[in-house]
Amino acid sequence: MMTLALALGLTATAANADYRVVPLPREIATAKGDAYRLNGETRIVYQGDADMARNATFLAEYIAEKTGMKLTTAVADKKNQRGNIVLRTDAKMKEAEGYRIEVSARGITISGATAQGVFYGIQTLRKSLPVLTQAEEVTLPAVVINDAPRFAYRGMHLDCSRHFFSADFVKQYIDMLALHNMNRFHWHLTEDQGWNIEIKKYPRLTEVGAWRSGTTVGRNSDVDDHVRYGGFYTQEQVRDIVKYAADRYITIIPEIDMPGHMLAALAAYPELGCTGGPYEVGHYWGVYRDILCGGNPKTYQFIKDVLDEICDLFPSEYIHIGGDEAPKMRWEKCPKCQQMISDK
């Protein structure tokens, strides 16, 4: 077992960094001179404000996870920069999310026009380190890395309605986004199969809509497991997750899908549908014909109330409202909808 562990590098006392990470930086230039030797005596020093202090703490945590080394952090001064890892902002750098990493025997410097740019440089350094559990030293070859994102919007999506994920898992997902320099998280929170965010003005959305009495097993299947399933995020949890993401320079874009994909909401408040129900939170995958009633004034009040609370929770510039897969069969036969069409 020890031989295998050593082969994997898990208990090795020394190893080399590898700068060929994902996403690959724009420019990796080998520099002259000796490598830097990262060890337990290394300190992380930072120039700047609370954002840079947080960056330094993140880097210390990342290095501890990868190597077992527990490095201390400190505000940079004239005496403590040489031989250590220095985090700094540089007003001469033009791209707000860009960064520069310089490694030499004298130390490591990560520079960025903003603290956000420095954070992305930290991710590149983090990914360059080998995975060790008891490292005494890591050698980082002399190098100059210059990088900046090609795309302003770099995001991923997570559907937490068809398959519910815990708040802790969502944070782990955000960690993975941060690791890969993502800056947007599209959080899918409502569906036919579940309404998974607390709305205080409409408590039945989570009392009823967050839970389904069974789930179709497999794709294009009529097999139902008849197992109660679901969950939801309290507003307190949402605020915590929003801050967690913001600390990692990730903006969360919540999705409240409408007027389709609203069966869970209709199960909680059947008066919002064209037929008045009864409705049941969706079991199977696909498109349901029951959607919000477009001719009912209560529908528009419901939408306003929900979005008011969502906007209070999420500081994002955008709120995603879906708009897809909304069959019109119910509207075509609904007197209220037809009257609305006629009037408007």
Which residues fall in each region the model found?
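A mature extracytoplasmic/lumenal domain signature
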Residues: 48-50, 89, 160-162, 189-191, ...
